[in-house]
């Protein structure tokens, strides 16, 4: 329905003046005639009544378009949306949402975001579909269908004999034989005595072994049936995803970088904070699950989101109507399996709560330590979230990029046995693009939302390429490397960080590096540190990879650090470098240090996470991972071979010249 309000030509009542700034003279200009019309349209949709009001100028594009849904007015959305916002009306745009990352999919242009290829249905021959995983048929003995047919023929003959016997017995009974007579009992006893010496074929009979005795006989038909049942279990995950998710799932990287550059940034305040202030219904409970990486807590802690949540809670507390439905915050520290085993759970819990409070987080309803990879704490977390959310709650999972949100949700769905499409997981920042609404994990009508990772530009890992990022990523339990450092010495952590001990009230201090073992180290004199960096950065000091790669990461800046402690054995303070790891200092006295790293990288001083150092000390000089040693060895061998060939060539040329 469209209602035309006015189509008249209006004339401006205001007489605009054009002022000359040089001579301050106001000159009158003619009144322009503006062809103008306005109107209303009413569009019915399945779930809500939508009214659209459009203000436009004739023969021109739309000036402004607003949309009213159930009385709430907001700017009308464009039909060229790229990412899902997790709203019910997202499904009404006629676009397919990628279940892996939340982007609207399209099959027109492969260079645009959300491209996917439609699946081709191919009829497979069932006779050729004989591939079954070995573990699915473990404990079964394979039997051919030909043998089954022979057995079926034998069974038919046996059935005929039994049938004839039964018919004969019936005729005998009709002739006066009594089944319950003593004569029948005597015959049964005689038969039992005759069969006492017989037993079923067992181990040692023919080719029957203990393994074959334990196995169950399975025919080819039954094998196909088992394969189909196993395929049905995974059918819920056999869905179409965008080309980006396909590349991340199968190759661990984004192949189309041109489409990646067209993706807009995620606006947390507009898309999430405003929805937390106004819940979808008065009876629904809002639960915010904040996911933080344990091995990079300060780098992955979403400070901006925590600040927004704190403001939301303050507004809700001041509002008497909304004070009943305050958002509940649950902090989940993931990847606890990567931390050293000597950290007690109680101490880790206190440390996490203290760091969250220092980061600006509001009051926490609960704190959970979880490992989605090793299934630690997932069951208890799921039970607590269900209890908080209730039957109609909304659970928002937020966190920094690559903090493990999608991995956690996949673990929750497996623990609950919910048939939910697997979210895309990859060691690449920004895997999830749009807000994904996930049903089936929580009870009744409660919903869970997976949100895009929040961008933290101060992370060291964001400066690196994919190969360098793999080197700094901690994938196994982090192991310490400790040095005893004197004043005037420096420790290089790859080509990314340098720590100088400028002065100290004691002779030496202990510095322990907690980072990936793929990152090389070096301990030497501070006076030679600059020369070491220029000569070995990108070669022995990796990452970065490449001789001139360090200059592409930015300029170095110095940060002065004052520390003090009362024990060499117990660490006094941690220096956290966002996106890389942390350094622990142990000393008995005071010291002044200088930390060098690239400009813009976040460096945080905090209480120590691990109070112990490594059981042994590293020697001065280079500490090189095996991979770098092999590469350098191959490179050195090539140089030696090249020099030997050049020397042989020079000798040959000299002899040739002498003969001539």
From Swiss-Prot:
What is the protein's major site of localization? plastid
Q: What happens when the gene is disrupted?
A: Chlorotic dwarf mutant pale green in bpg2-1 and bpg2-2. Reduced sensitivity in the light to chlorophyll accumulation promoted by brassinazole (Brz), a specific inhibitor of the biosynthesis of brassinosteroids (BRs), via the suppression of Brz-induced chloroplast protein accumulation. Decreased number of stacked grana thylakoids in chloroplast, but more starch grains, and more and larger plastoglobules. Abnormal accumulation of precursors of chloroplast 16S and 23S rRNA.
| Biased composition annotated in UniProt, kind: Acidic residues | 130-158
InterPro entries for the chain? G_CP_dom, GTP-bd, Mito_lipid_metab_GTPase, NOA1/YqeH-like_C, P-loop_NTPase
Q: How would you summarize where this protein is expressed among tissues?
A: Mostly expressed in stems, petioles, leaves and flowers and, at low levels, also in roots.
**Keywords on this record?**
Brassinosteroid signaling pathway, Chloroplast, GTP-binding, Hydrolase, Nucleotide-binding, Plastid, RNA-binding, rRNA processing, rRNA-binding, Transit peptide
Q: How does it assemble?
A: Binds to chloroplast 16S and 23S ribosomal RNAs.
Protein name in the entry: GTP-binding protein BRASSINAZOLE INSENSITIVE PALE GREEN 2, chloroplastic
